[in-house]
């Protein structure tokens, strides 16, 4: 493929980036109050442009290709999770589960330990369940509630959970990315875990220290309401079932049913902060509607990225990056660049590793790259990119649960950036020595 055709195939992505930057600058201008002018319009314009430049295909075929990406199986699964997450979050908030859980956290932890405590909780849960999505679903509503109670930055508190969720996504033995990375690079999970830990654990410790320092100035509310332990039960059950390995959709359904049962039961007993049957239905409906914009963004992202793939954009990236490799360090950098660029184009780190896994193995074997380090590079850089793109599943889900724009969360995502820097230094400085 010629440079012209390859760059044209990728141009919708370039346009999207320009629009996101422009809309972000517009939104932070104090003279403009509508901070929601970000991703929906940006993706609509980029999608129309992507369909328009797809020469050589009739318009119907272009639209079919776009629709295929927008309705892909893995994307639709995420959309159902958005629907259930919105339903659960709104049900829990309306019956007082969020407030009760926040009061419990504030009664146990001093205010200065809230930030590092949230990060450690996200790291622990994500390692236990192997999925960043489940971690975001379980903890973001609590983090957002704490932020409101402590008059802290909601975007920052949400970003702590999103960042910590990638600790487990990167290291957990049951994470999809770990499984795919080790299978494509033909190495043991335990060996990959050792190498990967040497690279990212120091970054996690530094981020934890940073959150500890940032938390020193936080003040707890002067008055903390009495904890209603029954209303904490839905979140407790969600955490336990998620850690036990239950499917995330089943977890959310169970959590929503528990919220309804406790809320309606409290109403029948005359307790305040509860709802009747139709109040529960109304809360669920509002939660689902609240996720509507993010669902549209996710579908438009899937459609546009499918157009890019169909036009040869991903093949162009792979060919260009692998054309000039001539050393072990260069091979490792090319593996990192491959998975990063493809992740930007697919918005799915597991798919990105699957796409470039075999070519990365060939590059690694040719230049003597240790399979364990290659797997660590694939996993770490894919998690870094997935954690920073504003149209990724986890970011959109977190934004919906916290009632924010993804751009409100992005500036505070320290951990994904930290592991990216750590992995890059590991390549440049030949660390760990034994595997370099």
Residue spans of the language-model regions?
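Alpha-helical transmembrane segments of multi-pass membrane proteins
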Residues: 81, 112-125, 151-167, 330-343, ...
């Amino acid at each position: 493929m010629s440079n012209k055709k390859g760059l044209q195939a990728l141009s919708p992505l370039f346009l999207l980036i320009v629009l996101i930057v422009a809309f972000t600058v517009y939104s932070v201008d104090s003279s403009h109050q509508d901070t929601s002018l970000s991703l929906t319009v940006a993706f609509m314009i980029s999608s129309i442009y992507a369909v328009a430049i797809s020469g050589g295909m009739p318009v119907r075929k272009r639209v079919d290709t776009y629709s295929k990406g927008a309705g892909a199986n893995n994307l639709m699964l995420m959309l159902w999770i958005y629907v259930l997450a919105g339903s659960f979050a709104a049900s829990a908030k309306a019956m007082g589960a969020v407030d009760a859980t926040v009061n419990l956290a504030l009664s146990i932890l001093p205010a200065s330990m809230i930030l590092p405590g949230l990060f450690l909780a996200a790291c622990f849960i994500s390692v236990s369940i192997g999925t960043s999505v489940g971690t975001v679903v379980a903890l973001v509503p609590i983090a957002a509630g704490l932020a409101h109670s402590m008059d802290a930055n909601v975007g920052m508190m949400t970003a702590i959970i999103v960042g910590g969720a990638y600790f487990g996504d990167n290291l957990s033995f049951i994470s999809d990315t770990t499984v795919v990375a080790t299978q494509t690079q033909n190495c043991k999970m335990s060996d990959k875990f050792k190498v990967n830990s040497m690279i990212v654990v120091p970054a996690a410790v530094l981020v934890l220290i940073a959150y500890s320092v940032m938390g020193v100035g936080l003040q707890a509310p002067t008055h903390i309401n009495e904890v209603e332990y029954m209303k904490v039960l839905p979140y407790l059950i969600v955490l336990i079932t998620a850690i036990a390995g239950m499917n995330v959709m089943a977890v959310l359904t169970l959590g929503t049913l528990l919220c309804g049962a406790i809320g309606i039961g409290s109403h029948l007993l005359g307790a305040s902060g509860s709802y009747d049957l139709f109040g529960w239905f109304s809360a669920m409906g509002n939660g689902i509607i609240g996720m509507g914009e993010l669902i549209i963004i996710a579908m438009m992202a899937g459609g546009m990225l499918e157009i890019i793939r169909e036009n040869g954009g991903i093949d162009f990236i792979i060919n260009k990056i692998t054309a000039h490799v001539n050393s072990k360090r260069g091979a490792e950098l090319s593996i990192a660049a491959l998975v990063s660029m493809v992740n930007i184009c697919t918005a799915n780190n597991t798919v990105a590793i699957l796409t470039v896994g075999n070519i990365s193995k060939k590059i690694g074997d040719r230049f003597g790259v240790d399979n364990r380090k290659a797997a660590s590079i694939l996993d770490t850089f894919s998690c870094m990119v997935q954690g920073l793109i504003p149209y990724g599943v986890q970011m959109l889900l977190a934004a919906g649960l916290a009632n924010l724009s993804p751009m409100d969360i992005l500036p505070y995502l320290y951990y994904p950036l930290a592991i990216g820097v750590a992995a890059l230094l590991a390549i440049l400085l030949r660390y760990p020595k034994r595997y370099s």
